[in-house]
Amino acid sequence: MNIVIGAAVSMEVIEGWIKQVNEEFGLTDKNQACLQHFAALKNYYIFIVESDFYAVLEPSVDIWGTREMHVVSYYIKPDKRNIRLFLKIQHKFEEISKAWDCKFLYQGSHLGDRLYSYLERNGYKVATMRKEIK
């Protein structure tokens, strides 16, 4: 897998993935906001960029010095979605987290119920709570 530290990823590559993902989910009106986000923060991210998928991870350290890895985003092209590739990506997340000496690996709340069930069976624990502010 092609692992790239933020600054080395071109905005053209990022823009291509943003357009594809947002088109699939009906979010093309969010393209510019997504581009601005990555332009501002890409130097802090770790990217896995392949022709069939991408992933974005963010290493961080909490106030007690505990290293953590956060899966900010990942996407697999619809015609390439299968359990084998999914497991390969999950394994790579763990490898990268270990290489960065992280104690915890977090994945976001946008994940579907089936994926949450799989992650729970493989050692993940619910770690965050979210409240929508209206």
Model regions: which residues?
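A conserved beta-strand-loop-helix scaffold within acyl/acetyltransferase catalytic domains
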Residues: 28-47, 54-65
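Short secondary-structure junctions
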Residues: 3-4, 122-127
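A structural microfeature
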Residues: 52-53, 128
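Short coil/turn motifs at secondary-structure junctions
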Residues: 60-62, 76-79, 134
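Short glycine-aromatic motifs
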Residues: 43-45, 121-124
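Short amphipathic alpha-helix that is part of the acyltransferase structural core
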Residues: 1-31
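Conserved catalytic-core motifs of GNAT/GCN5-like acyltransferases
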Residues: 108-109, 125-134
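Acyl-donor binding region in acyl/amide transferases
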Residues: 66-123
